[in-house]
From Swiss-Prot:
The N-terminus anchors the RBP to the virion. The central part and C-terminus probably binds and degrades the host exopolysaccharides. It comes from Klebsiella phage KN1-1. Keywords: Degradation of host capsule during virus entry, Degradation of host cell envelope components during virus entry, Host-virus interaction, Viral attachment to host adhesion receptor, Viral attachment to host cell, Viral tail protein, Virion, Virus entry into host cell. This is Depolymerase, capsule KN1-specific. Homotrimer. In the N-terminal section; belongs to the Teseptimavirus fiber family. Functions as a receptor binding protein (RBP) and probably mediates the attachment to the host capsular exopolysaccharides. Displays a depolymerase activity that specifically degrades the KN1-type polysaccharides of Klebsiella pneumoniae capsule, which allows the phage to reach the host cell membrane and bind the entry receptor. GO terms for biological process: adhesion receptor-mediated virion attachment to host cell; symbiont entry into host cell via disruption of host cell envelope; symbiont entry into host cell via disruption of host cell glycocalyx. It is found in: Virion. The keyword Ribosomal protein does not apply. GO terms for cellular component: virus tail. The keyword Calcium does not apply.
Length: 820
C-alpha cells in the first residue's frame, strides 16, 4: 500500500477504464501515467494510449494484461518554466502565483519521491517499504548486505549436507545415541529403547503391544479405537475460535476448512444443522476462449488467431474438489444460508455461488462429487460446476430463494435422486463458450488436439428421479430479475455475440466443420431444466422420471440437439405461461402473448420445448396456443398418442424418421399433423438437407400398330414420393403419315414390372392433334410398360384417322402405385 502522506502519486488497481487525478497540476505535460506490475512498469502516451475525459479524470485506451496497477504521478519540469519574466514586462500577481506554484510543485514532488526511497524507520533502521533492492554488490564484511543469489549459492551445499545427514539421524535432547543397524536388518520391526535409552529394533509379534502399534499406524487404525471416519465444521478451529450458532457468526471458513480436511483425508463432511455464510472465499472462473483457431484453418489463410478473452470470475462461498463428499442430515435439518435476496440484491459478478465445484483439470476434464441432504438458501447460484460432472450423485437437495439452482458445464452419468427448487431458474447444463472453432470434433479443440471434447460441455445420461420446481411470477421486480438472470447467462456463459464472425464483431471462425447451425439461446428462467449444446453436439439419454412444476412462465423443460432418448416420463405441470399465477388463465395474463418474451416464443409442447419426448402429463392453467402431448398404453389397443391444445392451430402430432450411422443419413419417413399426413421428401447429410426423391429418366419408344417409328424427341421423367410413382412422358414428332384406325402406343422402361393393378392410370394426356371435345386417358396393363390411349373413361382405344400429321406433341402424365 502506498504511503498516505504522498500526494503527487496515486495508484489504482486495474479493472476500471476511467481514473481520477486527485492532485492539481499546471500543465498536462507534467502528468505521467504508467502501467505497473511487481517486475515492470510502462509509461503510457497521451492521446494514443490514454486521453483526458476532464481536467481531473483520464480514460485508458489500451489493454492492461500483465499489469496490476495504474499509476498517475505529477512530474513538474524544473527547467521548462510556465512563466518567464523579462525586463520591462508588466508584473502580475497571477504570474507570480503560477511561478511560485511551479516551485512548490517541484518541491512537493521531490518530497514524495524521497518518501518512496529507502528512508529511516522509527527504530533507526532503513525502511525500503517492501520494495526489491537491486544492484547490490557482493558482500565483503560479515555485516554487509547479501543478494539472494549469493545466499542461495552459499547455503545450497550446506542444506544438502544437512538434509542428507538428518535422513540417517535420530535426535535426542542432551545426549548422543548409538547408530542403528542397516535398513535390511530393521525392516518390518518396531523401534524400542533399551535400559540405557538407546534405540533398538523390536520384533512385532502377533497380539503384542508392538503389533497393536503397527495396526494403529495403518490406514484403518482409527477404527480400532472407535474413531469416526468423517469431519464436521464443528470440529474445526479458525483463528482460535470454534463454530457457534445463533450469534451472527460467519460459518464459511469453518465449513471450507472441513471440506479441505475431508478432501485431504478422503472422508466425508457431515453437516448437521443450520449454517450462515457471508464471505466469498473463492473466485470461480467464467467461460472464455483462448483466441486460437484450428491450426489448419490458420495455415490455409482462412482464419487467424485473435487476442484471448479476458478471464472473469464469479464470487463463491465454498469450493468442492474432485471426490468431495458432503452429507447433510437432511434438507429439512441441514441448511446453509447466503445473503442474496430476490427483493433487493443485484445480479452481477459479485452475486454469490454457494457450491463452486471444480476438478484438477478444470474445464478440460471431469469432476465427481456427492452432495446430499442439504437445503441451500439465498444463493444467486446454488451449484456451479467447472468441467464435466462425471458419475456424481445428488440427493435430497433443496434450493430456496435462489437465482439459478445450478449452472454446469456438462454432465455424464450423473444421477439426481430428489431435487426441490424454488428459484428463477432450475438447473442449466451446457451452453458454455469455451473455444471459438465452429466444430465439435476433438481435433478442433485447443490445445489441438484435446483428449476429448471437454470444451463442448455435453450432457449425456443425466437422470432426475424426482424434480420439483416452483418459479416466480413475471411481475414487478420479479420481471426485472427474470430478465437480468437470462442476460447474465448470455453475457458471461453463452455469449451470443461471439457466434458472429470476427468481421461482424464476433469471435467465431470463418471456416467450419460443423454441419449444423449454432443454437440460439432461449430464456433460461421460468424453467425447471434447461439443456443446451453450445456447438450443436448431440445430447442423449437425459431423463426426468417425475416432474412437478408450479409457476413456469416458459416451457418447464428445454433441450436442444437432443435425441429421442431424452424424456420426461411423468409430469404434473401447473400454472404455465402466466404472468401472475393468482390472476389465472385469462386474457391479459399470458406470458409470451400479452408480454413479449425477449428471448423468443416457446415453440414446443409445454412440458418440453426443443427436442425430446414428454410421455405423460397433467396440466393445470395452460397458456393458450401451445400444445401438450401424451403417450399412453391403452388396454387392447397398443400405443396411443394423445394430444390436446386450447386452439385449432395446425401442429405436428407424430413424426417417424430413421438414422443410418454408417452413411450419416437421417431420413424423415412420415409426418402426421392435425390436418394432414405426408411422407416428407427430405434427408439430412452432414452438409445439410437434400431432396430424397427416388427419381430418374429414360427414353421411351413410340409405335403405330405395334411398329416402332422415328421421333425427334422422347423422354420420360419419373420420381417416387412415398407409395406413389409419378411419370411424365414427352414426345415430339415432326411428321407422320397414318392409315385409318391407327393406334399410337408408348413403351417406357420406367414401368418395368411396376404397375400394381391392371386398369386405367390416374393421369392426363395432351395430344396436339386432338379435335375439340375429345379427352384421353392413359392405360397400362399390370406388370407392363406400354401406355395406351383411350377415350375418356370408356374402354374404346383412341385411333387416328388416315392422313399426314405435322409437329405432333404428345404429353402423358400418370401416377401409379408401385409393386415395391
Amino acid at each position: 500500500m502506498m504511503n498516505q502522506d504522498i500526494k503527487t502519486i496515486i495508484q489504482y488497481p486495474v479493472g476500471d477504464v476511467e481514473f481520477d487525478i486527485p492532485f492539481d497540476y499546471l500543465s498536462r505535460k507534467f502528468v505521467r501515467v504508467y502501467l505497473v506490475s511487481p517486475l515492470n512498469r510502462r509509461q503510457l502516451n497521451n492521446i494514443t494510449e490514454y486521453r483526458y475525459v476532464s481536467r481531473t479524470r483520464i480514460k485508458l485506451l489500451v489493454e492492461t494484461a500483465g499489469f496490476n496497477l495504474i499509476e498517475i504521478r505529477r512530474f513538474t519540469s524544473a527547467s521548462e518554466r510556465v512563466v518567464d519574466f523579462s525586463d520591462g514586462s508588466v508584473l502580475r500577481a497571477t504570474d507570480l502565483n503560477v511561478s511560485q506554484l511551479q516551485s512548490a510543485h517541484i518541491a512537493e514532488e521531490a518530497r514524495d519521491a524521497a518518501m518512496l526511497t529507502i528512508s529511516p524507520a522509527d527504530d533507526g533502521s532503513l525502511d525500503a517499504s517492501g520494495k526489491v533492492i537491486k544492484n547490490v554488490g557482493t558482500p565483503v564484511q560479515s555485516s554487509d548486505a547479501a543478494t539472494k543469489g549469493y545466499v542461495d549459492t552459499a547455503v545450497s551445499p550446506l542444506a544438502t549436507t544437512i538434509e542428507a545427514n538428518f535422513m540417517r539421524t535420530l535426535r535426542t535432547s542432551g545426549r548422543s545415541i548409538r547408530e542403528l543397524p542397516g535398513a535390511s536388518e530393521v525392516a518390518g520391526m518396531l523401534l524400542g529403547f533399551n535400559g540405557e535409552g538407546d534405540p533398538v529394533p523390536v520384533v512385532a509379534g502377533e497380539g503384542t503391544a508392538s503389533d497393536v502399534m503397527l495396526k494403529l499406524a495403518g490406514t484403518t487404525g482409527l477404527s480400532y479405537i472407535g474413531g469416526v471416519g468423517y469431519v464436521t465444521p464443528e470440529m474445526m478451529t479458525v483463528d482460535g475460535k470454534t463454530l457457534v450458532r445463533g450469534l451472527g457468526q460467519d460459518h464459511v471458513r469453518f465449513i471450507q476448512k472441513a471440506i479441505d480436511e475431508g478432501h485431504r483425508r478422503n472422508v466425508p463432511v457431515i453437516l448437521s444443522g443450520g449454517y450462515e455464510v457471508y464471505e466469498t472465499l473463492h473466485d470461480a472462473p467464467l467461460p472464455r476462449d483462448d483466441g486460437t483457431a484450428y491450426p489448419e484453418w490458420v495455415a490455409n489463410g482462412g482464419d487467424s488467431n485473435i487476442r484471448p478473452e479476458e478471464q472473469l470470475y464469479q464470487k463463491a462461498h465454498l469450493r468442492l474438489y474432485n471426490n468431495s463428499v458432503i452429507l447433510g442430515a437432511g434438507s429439512q435439518i441441514a441448511t446453509i444460508r447466503s445473503t442474496w435476496a430476490r427483493s433487493t440484491s443485484a445480479v452481477g459478478l459479485t452475486s454469490p455461488i454457494m457450491w463452486y465445484i471444480e476438478g484438477p483439470l478444470g474445464n478440460r476434464g471431469t469432476v465427481s462429487y456427492v452432495l446430499k441432504g442439504i437445503k441451500t438458501i439465498g444463493a444467486y447460484i446454488g451449484r456451479y460446476v467447472v468441467g464435466i460432472s462425471y458419475r456424481s450423485v445428488e440427493d435430497d437437495l433443496e434450493f430456496a430463494g435462489c437465482g439459478i439452482a445450478g449452472v454446469k458445464q456438462g454432465e455424464e452419468q450423473t444421477i439426481h435422486r430428489k431435487i426441490v427448487i424454488t428459484a428463477y431458474a432450475g438447473d442449466v447444463t451446457g451452453g458454455w463458450w469455451l473455444q471459438r472453432n465452429n466444430a465439435y470434433g476433438a481435433k478442433y479443440m485447443p490445445p489441438y488436439t484435446d483428449t476429448d471434447v471437454w470444451l463442448l460441455g455435453w450432457c449425456d445420461s443425466s437422470t432426475y428421479e424426482y424434480l420439483s420446481y416452483t418459479g416466480y411470477d413475471y411481475d414487478g421486480r420479479d420481471a426485472l430479475v427474470h430478465d437480468w438472470i437470462s442476460e447474465w447467462f448470455d453475457t458471461y456463459i453463452f455469449k451470443t455475440a461471439n457466434s458472429r464472425k470476427v468481421s461482424e464483431g464476433g469471435r467465431l471462425t470463418y471456416q467450419s466443420a460443423n454441419p449444423y447451425p449454432l443454437p440460439t439461446l432461449k430464456g433460461i428462467t421460468g424453467r425447471a431444466r434447461y439443456i443446451t449444446s453450445r456447438y450443436s453436439r448431440q445430447n442423449a439419454l437425459n431423463v426426468i422420471n417425475t416432474l412437478k412444476t408450479l409457476i413456469t412462465i416458459r416451457a418447464p423443460g428445454y433441450m436442444d440437439n437432443s435425441t429421442q432418448s431424452c424424456r420426461i416420463l411423468n409430469a404434473m405441470i401447473e400454472s404455465v405461461g402466466l404472468i401472475r399465477r393468482t390472476s389465472g388463465a385469462n386474457a391479459g395474463n399470458y406470458f409470451g402473448i400479452d408480454v413479449v418474451d425477449k428471448w423468443g416464443a416457446d415453440t414446443g409442447v409445454w412440458g418440453l420445448e426443443g427436442t425430446g419426448i414428454l410421455e405423460k402429463q397433467l396440466v393445470v392453467f395452460l397458456r393458450p396456443g401451445v400444445p401438450c402431448t401424451n403417450a399412453v398404453v391403452a388396454t387392447g389397443a397398443g400405443q396411443i398418442f394423445e394430444s390436446w391444445t386450447t386452439t385449432n392451430a395446425q401442429r405436428r402430432l407424430l413424426a417417424l424418421r430413421d438414422w443410418n450411422p454408417a452413411t450419416q443419413v437421417q431420413t424423415y419417413r412420415y409426418d402426421f399433423r392435425t390436418d394432414y399426413a405426408l411422407m416428407r421428401p427430405t434427408r439430412y447429410y452432414t452438409d445439410g438437407p437434400l431432396w430424397n426423391y427416388s427419381k430418374g429418366t429414360s427414353t421411351p419408344t413410340v409405335a403405330v400398330n405395334g411398329s416402332t417409328i422415328a421421333v425427334q424427341k422422347a423422354v420420360t421423367n419419373w420420381y417416387r414420393l412415398g407409395d406413389i410413382m409419378r411419370c411424365n412422358i414427352y414426345v415430339e414428332i415432326n411428321s407422320i403419315t397414318l392409315q385409318g384406325n391407327s393406334e399410337l402406343t408408348v413403351t417406357t422402361p420406367s414401368f418395368n414390372g411396376s404397375w400394381e393393378v391392371a386398369g386405367q392410370g390416374i393421369g392426363k394426356v395432351y395430344l396436339s392433334t386432338l379435335t375439340g371435345g375429345v379427352t384421353l386417358t392413359p392405360v397400362i396393363q399390370q406388370g407392363g410398360n406400354v401406355v395406351r390411349l383411350r377415350k375418356g373413361s370408356s374402354p374404346e382405344v383412341y385411333a387416328f384417322e388416315a392422313g399426314t400429321y405435322n409437329n405432333v406433341v404428345l404429353i402423358i402424365g400418370i401416377d401409379y402405385v408401385p409393386l415395391s
